[in-house]
């Protein structure tokens, strides 16, 4: 087996940044000429995060093949510039589903199905599947979600313990990310949480090879010696992961610490020098803007910024491409109406309405869109944001006062947005069919679909091609019954499915920049290659700000 495996665990508390650490390490190894992939193992019982509340889980990241996955896969794609797939994320729920299906099929020949070996074997097969095929990567980084000590994570930790034994030390590496808090009152770092976390890991049978210490400032050498002594690792295998203002600095910080070099030595990887010119330019451009624009994000999950993680990053990418700083103003759509919209959006150079589900906060989004349209503020609507733009235009420009989505009002005579009952899936070559009674999980129009772009439109100006592929996650779509009526009032449909049956992009050509898309372009934006629509949106905001 040519693939080397790196397992990343976390201790003390959650949200330490395992995903960013894994992505940054992967990026560094990639600059050494190695092929890298990353997989996230989530211990929760949900089959996938598709039906989870964004306030609990954050963003659901959608892959090209239609998997609804953890937001960390967004970090993986952005840092590696390699598309992820459903193979790159699995959960306890998915693992148990597979094992139970096999038991029902009789695959276990009457055996008593247990966590060990059946669940752990299934986990191992998911991990090892990354090393299959001629295009198997040189390195596979496996991030185990949650915190060491969580009862849900025990089968995953047992599985990686077994893999270490089966694959050998030269092919496996265990990295443990832990918190080293700095007590300002005492003026010192505290290592006790790290010691206890490693002790917990050792009790499971896993000896970390490298300890990555999340801290406010770099830890001194005497502290590294202490951690190495108590945690049974080499002193040069204890690294700092310091807080940064710009997350794209993390690979550079790791490189300065010698983190990737130590990993390469321990796994006997080719020790070519990392080529970091592109990362250095990215950070330099990001830290030295030539102006500033303010963009309002109008949503109902704004109290948890992680719910819009890819969106946030895509706007930053657009700023880097335009050499401007993008200040984001999160506005709760439940607090917006026509009477106070001017107050909420005073000083904004762009207004973005993202996706979402359910009626709560929708009228506030519509009020924000009306303000953007009437006041010539650059507007970008994504998924539900596009649908709300259609509703607003129908109500106020096409004399359809009760215009709405079928999702929100079944009694409306002008359902300009309605439930998709069937569509063609070009990947499976099947016609997918749904109705109001279908299961919620995994039943939307998901993944990458082609879009035909109309020449001489804002969209074509951005893409510079007439055919693109974008990622979708929705049940509702524009109702073509109203296409002619809205077109007569000035709306154009600049992007459609190849057969012309589904409206994917809408624009108002008389507006400085007003565009809505049914897909999620933020999932395909990259720090060194901003998505064309985000690049153009921020460019329009820059023009509005007169920067």
UniProtKB/Swiss-Prot annotation:
Residues 294-547 form the Glutamine amidotransferase type-1 domain. Signal peptide: none annotated. It comes from the Bacteria. ATP binds at residues 15-20, 72. Its EC number is 6.3.4.2. The active site is at 383 (nucleophile), 520, 522. One of its GO terms (molecular function) is identical protein binding. Pathway: Pyrimidine metabolism; CTP biosynthesis via de novo pathway; CTP from UDP: step 2/2. GO terms for cellular component: cytosol. CDD domains: CTPS_N (cd03113), GATase1_CTP_Synthase (cd01746). It holds the Pfam family CTP_synth_N. Residues 1-269 are annotated as: Amidoligase domain. Mg(2+) binds at residues 72, 143. L-glutamine binds at residues 356, 384-387, 407, 475. CTPSs have evolved a hybrid strategy for distinguishing between UTP and CTP. The overlapping regions of the product feedback inhibitory and substrate sites recognize a common feature in both compounds, the triphosphate moiety. To differentiate isosteric substrate and product pyrimidine rings, an additional pocket far from the expected kinase/ligase catalytic site, specifically recognizes the cytosine and ribose portions of the product inhibitor. PANTHER family: CTP SYNTHASE, CTP SYNTHASE-RELATED. Homotetramer. Belongs to the CTP synthase family. Catalyzes the ATP-dependent amination of UTP to CTP with either L-glutamine or ammonia as the source of nitrogen. Regulates intracellular CTP levels through interactions with the four ribonucleotide triphosphates. This is CTP synthase. It comes from Desulfovibrio desulfuricans (strain ATCC 27774 / DSM 6949 / MB).
């Amino acid at each position: 087996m040519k693939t080397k495996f790196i397992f990343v665990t976390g201790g003390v508390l959650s949200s330490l940044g395992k995903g960013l650490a894994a992505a940054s390490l992967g990026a560094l190894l990639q600059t050494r000429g190695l092929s890298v992939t990353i997989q996230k193992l989530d211990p929760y019982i949900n089959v996938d995060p598709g039906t989870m509340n964004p306030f609990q889980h954050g963003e659901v990241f959608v892959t090209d093949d239609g998997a609804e996955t953890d937001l960390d896969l967004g970090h993986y794609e952005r840092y590696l510039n390699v598309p992820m797939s459903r193979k790159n994320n699995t959960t306890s729920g998915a693992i148990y589903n597979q094992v139970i299906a096999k038991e029902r099929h009789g695959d276990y020949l009457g055996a008593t199905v247990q966590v060990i070996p059946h669940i752990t074997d299934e986990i191992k097969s998911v991990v090892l599947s990354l090393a299959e095929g001629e295009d198997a990567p040189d390195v596979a980084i496996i991030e185990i979600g949650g915190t060491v000590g969580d009862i849900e994570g025990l089968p995953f930790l047992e599985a990686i313990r077994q893999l270490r034994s089966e694959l050998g030390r030269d092919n496996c590496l265990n990295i443990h990310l832990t918190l080293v808090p700095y007590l300002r009152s005492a003026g010192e770092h505290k290592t006790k949480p790290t010691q206890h976390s490693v002790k917990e890991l050792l009790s499971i049978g896993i000896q970390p090879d490298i300890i990555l210490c999340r801290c406010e400032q770099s830890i001194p050498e005497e502290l590294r010696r202490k951690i190495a002594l108590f945690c049974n690792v080499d002193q040069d295998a204890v690294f700092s992961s310091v807080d940064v203002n710009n997350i794209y600095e993390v690979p550079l910080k790791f490189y300065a610490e010698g983190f990737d070099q130590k990993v390469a030595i321990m796994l006997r990887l080719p020790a070519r020098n990392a080529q970091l010119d592109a990362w250095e330019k990215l950070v330099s451009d990001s830290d030295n803007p030539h102006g500033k624009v303010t963009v309002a994000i109008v949503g109902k999950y704004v109290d948890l910024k992680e719910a819009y993680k890819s969106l946030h990053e895509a706007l930053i990418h657009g700023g880097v491409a335009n050499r401007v700083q993008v200040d984001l103003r999160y506005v709760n759509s439940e607090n917006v109406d026509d009477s106070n919209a001017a107050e909420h959006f005073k000083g904004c150079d762009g207004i973005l309405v993202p996706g979402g589900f359910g009626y709560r906060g929708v009228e506030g989004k519509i009020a924000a869109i009306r303000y953007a349209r009437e006041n010539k503020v650059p507007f970008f609507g994504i998924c539900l944001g596009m649908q709300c733009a259609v509703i607003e235009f129908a109500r106020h420009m096409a004399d359809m006062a009760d215009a709405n989505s079928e999702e929100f009002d079944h009694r409306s005579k002008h359902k300009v947005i309605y439930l998709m009952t069937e569509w063609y899936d070009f990947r499976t070559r099947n016609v997918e069919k749904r109705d109001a009674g279908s299961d919620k999980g995994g039943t939307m129009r998901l993944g990458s679909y082609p879009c035909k772009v109309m020449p001489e439109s804002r969209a074509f100006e951005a893409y510079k091609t007439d055919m693109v592929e974008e990622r979708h996650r929705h049940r509702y779509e524009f109702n073509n019954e109203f296409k002619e009526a809205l077109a007569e009032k000035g709306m154009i449909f600049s992007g459609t499915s190849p057969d012309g049956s589904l409206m994917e992009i809408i624009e108002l050509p008389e507006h400085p920049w007003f565009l809505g898309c049914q897909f999620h372009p933020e999932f395909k934006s990259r720090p060194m290659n901003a998505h064309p629509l985000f690049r153009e949106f921020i460019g329009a905001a820059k023009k509005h700000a007169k920067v």
